[in-house]
């Protein structure tokens, strides 16, 4: 009995001693890492789909190993955060910081994408609206970030052109706001009453505060202000919501959307909407899109004293619930372009555009 008491006392003393010898700096690093884990587990929208019974042991082992590595000085707390966030493989969930090295180092752990700049002499897609030939008009739309006004102008130019065929080239379009592509979608739409996938918020007080939404703004949006009694998962767009418009545009007769592996988020949503509601539109490309469209509405979690910021999605598509996710495989083109990458993609009419223009004439 006395032997057991002595052993217990020695163990307690050893534990206390080990704890007391942990430097304050390491404790601070661990606290920062733990705060990121807490945010992911309590605010990251698709967490319950990302960590399941199948991979729960792997996830817990990763956390344990990263804490151990920080404690023993085998890796920095930043590197542990990079490895942790990268494990989820979600391009809407990523790390950046006060200098470009933060994102560069995080990218080592992020889900890989095709690096077209290594395959081409110049990869810098720029907005274009011009005639390819007598039958075909090209709109190159490389971003959905605050570009709706430009899109409206490009749509007007196409309508005035008289060209029966339209190519919308969205290579390199990493997203932005869905409203930006709406002028194009309204031209492509030809299938009334087709139903969209829904959107669900993981509705936490922390995320709402990070978005900067006031109580008045929440009320104007019809969202709960009593977080204690609000549902954790709140349906924002009901699954099966339909597209219905008053008219269908006569032109284009045929349409193409050109994609690549850099197309993501709102860029991919344009592809999904067109595939759903436009029978006259085909998707062309060599590679699948990135696969970054099943999450969204992203606030920032800032670790101010460390110069590190984490973007994470507070919303997910109901495709997660239905097992029909686009992420992470991306959207496959309807037609695979049988050509290598062009040497240049800037403000030029490249080989892919010419090939697609000919294919639309068939």
Which residues fall in each region the model found?
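Active-site rim recognition segments
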Residues: 315-349
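Cysteine-dependent hydrolase recognition
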Residues: 215, 222-239, 245, 263, ...
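Sec-dependent N-terminal signal peptides
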Residues: 4-17
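Flexible, low-complexity junctional segments that flank or bridge functional domains
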Residues: 20-223, 251-254, 280-282, 289-305, ...
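Conserved active-site loop/cleft motifs that coordinate metal ions or position small ligands
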Residues: 311-313
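Cell-envelope and extracellular/periplasmic
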Residues: 171, 251, 257, 331, ...
């Amino acid at each position: 009995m006395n032997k057991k008491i002595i052993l217990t006392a020695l163990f307690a003393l050893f534990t206390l001693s080990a704890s007391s010898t942990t430097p304050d700096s390491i404790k601070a690093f661990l606290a920062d890492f733990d705060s990121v884990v807490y945010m992911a587990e309590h605010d990251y929208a698709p967490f319950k789909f990302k960590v399941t019974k199948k991979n729960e042991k792997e996830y817990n082992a990763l956390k344990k190993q990263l804490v151990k590595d920080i404690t023993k000085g085998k890796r920095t707390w930043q590197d542990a955060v990079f490895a942790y966030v990268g494990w989820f493989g979600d391009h809407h969930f990523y790390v950046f910081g006060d200098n470009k090295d933060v994102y560069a180092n995080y990218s080592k752990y992020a889900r890989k994408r095709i690096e077209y700049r290594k395959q081409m002499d110049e990869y810098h897609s720029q907005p274009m609206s011009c005639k390819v030939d007598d039958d075909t008009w090209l709109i190159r739309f490389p971003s959905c970030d605050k570009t709706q006004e430009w899109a409206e102008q490009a749509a007007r130019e196409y309508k005035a052109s008289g060209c029966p065929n339209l190519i919308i080239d969205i290579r390199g379009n990493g997203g932005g706001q869905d409203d930006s592509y709406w002028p194009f979608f309204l031209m492509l739409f030809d299938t009334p009453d087709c139903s969209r996938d829904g959107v669900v918020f993981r509705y936490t007080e922390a995320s709402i505060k990070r978005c900067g939404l006031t109580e008045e703004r929440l009320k104007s949006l019809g969202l709960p202000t009593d977080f204690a009694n609000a549902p954790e998962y709140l349906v924002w767009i009901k699954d099966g919501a339909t597209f219905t418009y008053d008219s269908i545009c006569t032109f284009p007769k045929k349409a193409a959307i050109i994609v690549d592996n850099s197309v993501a988020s709102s860029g991919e949503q344009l592809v999904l909407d067109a595939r759903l509601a436009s029978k006259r539109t085909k998707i062309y490309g060599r590679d699948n899109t990135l696969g970054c469209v099943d999450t969204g509405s992203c606030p920032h979690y800032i670790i101010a004293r460390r110069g590190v910021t984490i973007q994470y999605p507070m919303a997910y598509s109901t495709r997660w619930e239905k097992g029909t996710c686009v992420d992470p495989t991306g959207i496959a083109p309807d037609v695979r372009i049988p050509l290598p990458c062009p040497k240049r993609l800037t403000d030029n009419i490249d080989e892919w555009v010419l090939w697609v223009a000919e294919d639309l004439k068939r």
